[in-house]
Amino acid sequence: MNYSHNEIEKKWQDYWEANKTFKTSDNLGQKKFYALDMFPYPSGAGLHVGHPEGYTATDIISRYKRMLGYNVLHPMGWDAFGLPAEQYALDTGNDPREFTKENIQTFKRQIKELGFSYDWDREVNTTDPEYYKWTQWIFIQLYNKGLAYVDEVAVNWCPALGTVLSNEEVIDGVSERGGHPVYRRPMKQWVLKITEYADRLLEDLDELDWPESLKDMQRNWIGRSEGASVAFDVKDYNEQIEVFTTRPDTIYGASFLVLSPEHELVDLITTEDNKDDVEAYQKEAAKKSDLERTGLSKEKSGVFTGAYAVNPLSGQQVPIWIADYVLSTYGTGAVMAVPSGDQRDYEFAKTFDLPIIEVIEGGDMSKEAYTGDGPHINSGELNGLYNEAAIEKAIELLENKNAGTRKVNYKLRDWLFSRQRYWGEPIPVIHWEDGSMTTVPEDELPLLLPETDEIKPSGTGESPLANIDEFVNVVDEATGMKGRRETNTMPQWAGSCWYYLRYIDPDNEQMLADPEKLKHWLPVDLYIGGVEHAVLHLLYARFWHKVLFDLGVVPTKEPFQKLFNQGMILGEGNEKMSKSKGNVINPDDIVKSHGADTLRLYEMFMGPLDAAIAWSENGLDGSRRFLDRIWRLLITEDGSISNKVVNNHSKALDKSYHQTVKKVTEDYNSLNFNTAISQLMVFINDCYKAEEIYKPYIEGFIKMLAPIAPHISEELWSRLGHDETITYQPWPSYDEALLVDDEIEIVVQVNGKVRAKINVSKDIAKEEMEQIALDNEHVKSEIEGKDIKKVIAVPKKLVNIVAK
């Protein structure tokens, strides 16, 4: 008889909810485990089969740790602000609040139907004023610490979306969402000073149990490099151009300077003859994304300004060009171009027929730039020195002339924090008519997002909030001074920077979270989510955490101790699942046809957790067959427990059971769920072969299955006569001594030919081995009537009988 998944799964989900089975205790004396999922954005499409892969993994570990006696914090919530809900509201005329609320209900239903053991009393929602009150509070702390400031920056302006986008939201010159054209334009923006934490963000990666590849992505994003800052005087102007270079030793080969089209000196130093060309070039550059501008394969373009700078060491005059491959947001927005030592400069020099001065021996300047080591030439006091010594000497010479200094540079930019949208947290700042700026008093938080039907972007660069007079205009009651509220909102990243902290104390109205509770639960022990968040979310969350650590709010330097990226589930043809391809699989359909336990089991059995693997209907069916097999082994047609399950200890399954406990325990600890399931299958095969199954062994098996397939496990546990949920039952243990067989197989030979194989005790004496061999029926018939000359017994291996 196969089991009815619909009936059983509903029954146990109702039981868990009614009994609050997974409620996290506030017992701070118990050992803890904090298992965290990257909370989802509740889109209109609902869950797809990719979501449950990571969620199932954390759920297995959460259920496993509860059985090991841990107090487990395993929460879920919603990252619900952001562009998609607003875009939907614009397209349909619906309120993003309603849309978001409905989507959350769908997601929550789907998640509950998959049997995940979340403590729903700790649910958070980034759009709830009681939540974003504390997001705003953190912003105020950043502001007070000098880490939030207003700056005029060249931003990615998307007219179609009516907002500024971060660099990460722009791909190949168009918006990631919707594919609309994006242009560069200067605008006043809120910026967070993440660069102040660059060194700590880099150094503390070493202490984390994260995939090395992911740590490298963060290291590259931060991009620390050592070198020198060098000042070039601009000829005929009382101005200097500062450049950063990692190779100050090549300064004698600097045959021109290149400024970004947005550099502040461009308009000042451009000569009358070159003005039209320069302005036309600036306009074109404004239409390109940073990625397009810096692509290595693109044609080199640029324009001469007509101005010259003076090389501080050689005294040579060098022309000043502008080119879009230099970004105003990176370094100083100016580079010292050394065509003989940098391939991009080399190609630029070749394109515009600029001088190429060889300064390091070893290359062929007619073919390409030389980036290797070698003795310096044409380099004044640096001649004859190799790279390392030449770098030190060059810095010394520059410092002596007050023309440069040793410097560390970062690729990391400060975080552009404001968005010209409606659906986000209001930034709690007031701009007063006297030009001053204050934050909203903390006792007035949350600063509520006003409800309005008019959420279209203003198109001026201001957010839709600028259209709501009663929100914008304020008067200081004490002085009568008028002010305007900040109308930009925070990016979606804001709420997701700290949500893991709020789960720890979600109902606290007095503070972000109780310090004692934070001390107990932090850091997060296991964080599972997609690799697409490797840099941004994880870097931003680490930054905020470090600020909160400095403020004494959190007790740890880092938020997430162990991090794991689950792989992607692909469509059957190894293609990414997408609506346009029509290959998206809805978990609701699988839960209905095969059951939640089958889906959980299948997604963990597909392969290693971090691999990208194609969905297979056959694999899904196979997982269901395994659960049916377990059911049929233990439950008879009338629904009672099979009489194969016995209370007296037959030793037949000792080795198989203890091996299974050992293997599954090790595999759960290392997140190798696919091989754990294989071992559970081996044990069930052995149970089918056995005449009897010792009841404690089948109970231990059900405990091991429960983290993966909790519904069928609860049902079997209950039918075995237990009144309580399996959730908090102790995890099975294994005996090393029983991992090896009591019996071994030995070979019996007569005159060198194998005549029998027999099982004997592994501790059997030689004499007894010989006697058992001689008593064997096959051997007897072989030696009948013959004279036994010799019997040779090799312990644990064989008995050889020589008979004539």
From Swiss-Prot:
Keyword DNA-binding part of the UniProt annotation: no
Domain of life, source organism: Bacteria
Annotated ATP binding sites: 579
Cellular localization per UniProt: Cytoplasm
Motif annotated as 'KMSKS' region, chain positions: 576-580
EC number(s) stated in the UniProt entry for this protein: 6.1.1.4
InterPro entries for the chain: aa-tRNA-synth_I_CS (IPR001412), aa-tRNA-synth_Ia (IPR002300), Leu-tRNA-ligase (IPR002302), Leu_tRNA-synth_edit (IPR025709), M/V/L/I-tRNA-synth_anticd-bd (IPR013155), Methionyl/Leucyl_tRNA_Synth (IPR015413), Rossmann-like_a/b/a_fold (IPR014729), tRNAsynth_Ia_anticodon-bd (IPR009080)
Keyword field: Aminoacyl-tRNA synthetase, ATP-binding, Cytoplasm, Ligase, Nucleotide-binding, Protein biosynthesis
Broad class of the protein's primary localization: cytoplasm
Class of enzymatic activity (EC top level): ligase
Reaction equation(s) it catalyzes: tRNA(Leu) + L-leucine + ATP = L-leucyl-tRNA(Leu) + AMP + diphosphate
SUPFAM superfamilies to which the protein is assigned, alphabetical: Anticodon-binding domain of a subclass of class I aminoacyl-tRNA synthetases (SSF47323), Nucleotidylyl transferase (SSF52374), ValRS/IleRS/LeuRS editing domain (SSF50677)
Annotated Gene3D superfamilies: 3.10.20.590, HUPs (3.40.50.620), Isoleucyl-tRNA Synthetase, Domain 1 (1.10.730.10)
GO MF terms, alphabetically ordered: aminoacyl-tRNA deacylase activity; ATP binding; leucine-tRNA ligase activity
Biological process according to GO: leucyl-tRNA aminoacylation
Pfam families to which the protein is assigned, alphabetical: Anticodon_1, tRNA-synt_1, tRNA-synt_1_2, tRNA-synt_1g
GO cellular component: cytosol
Keyword Cytoplasm recorded: yes
Segments carrying motif 'HIGH' region: 40-51
Assigned protein family: Belongs to the class-I aminoacyl-tRNA synthetase family.
Protein known as: Leucine--tRNA ligase
Species name: Staphylococcus saprophyticus subsp. saprophyticus (strain ATCC 15305 / DSM 20229 / NCIMB 8711 / NCTC 7292 / S-41)
